[in-house]
């Protein structure tokens, strides 16, 4: 627990007056800090500052341990829902045959359906580097074949002796 969070509870509250909210949500009005602490102590609960920037600051009477547990639970749930997107790679050659292309296309479809991004790359070997237009045609063919279920994130570009593009899965909005 950080020091900043500690200072928002019970004796850590520095404000002279607070707008007090009871544990059931009832507004108790503006009270002195000592009076609010006494009310919280009588209820065997904690006084927690929920809106420190308000004038006067808003404090609520609650079980701080339970509140912290609920916050941690919400944070864990939020982290679970975050998806880590990985980039998968499909390698092609400039002189790729139709059946080989279809196989690589199925691999790209599988990766995109799982929610991963796909980097499609063509490696030019030897003198093939002089035929960049053929490589661009192959990548454009891949874009056309996957346009129903993907969007182009990075259009074909050269990087050394290879040309690549990045496809991302289409999001339903």
Curated annotation (Swiss-Prot):
Keywords: Cytoplasm, Initiation factor, Protein biosynthesis. NCBIfam families: infC (TIGR00168). Monomer. InterPro entries: T_IF-3_C_sf, T_IF-3_N_sf, Translation_initiation_fac3_CS, Translation_initiation_fac_3, Translation_initiation_fac_3_C, Translation_initiation_fac_3_N. HAMAP family: IF_3 (MF_00080). Pfam families: IF3_C, IF3_N. IF-3 binds to the 30S ribosomal subunit and shifts the equilibrium between 70S ribosomes and their 50S and 30S subunits in favor of the free subunits, thus enhancing the availability of 30S subunits on which protein synthesis initiation begins. Belongs to the IF-3 family. One of its GO terms (cellular component) is membrane. One of its GO terms (molecular function) is ribosome binding. It is found in: Cytoplasm. One of its GO terms (biological process) is ribosome disassembly. This is Translation initiation factor IF-3. The keyword Iron-sulfur does not apply. It comes from the Bacteria. Its main location: cytoplasm.
């Amino acid at each position: 627990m950080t020091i900043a969070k500690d200072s928002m509870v019970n004796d850590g509250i520095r404000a002279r007056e607070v707008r007090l909210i009871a544990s059931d949500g009832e507004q108790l009005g503006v009270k002195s800090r000592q009076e609010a602490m006494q009310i919280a102590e009588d209820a065997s609960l904690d006084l927690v500052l929920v809106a420190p920037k308000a004038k006067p600051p808003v404090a609520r009477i609650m079980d701080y341990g339970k509140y912290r547990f609920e916050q941690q639970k919400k944070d864990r749930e939020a982290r679970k829902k975050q998806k880590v997107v990985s980039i998968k790679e499909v390698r092609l050659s400039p002189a790729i045959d139709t059946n080989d292309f279809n196989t690589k296309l199925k691999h790209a479809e599988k990766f995109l359906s799982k929610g991963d991004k796909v980097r499609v790359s063509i490696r030019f070997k030897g003198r093939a580097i002089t035929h960049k237009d053929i490589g661009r045609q192959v990548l454009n063919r891949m874009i056309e074949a996957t346009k129903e279920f993907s969007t182009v994130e990075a259009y074909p570009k050269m990087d050394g002796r290879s040309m690549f593009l990045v496809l991302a899965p289409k999001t339903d909005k």
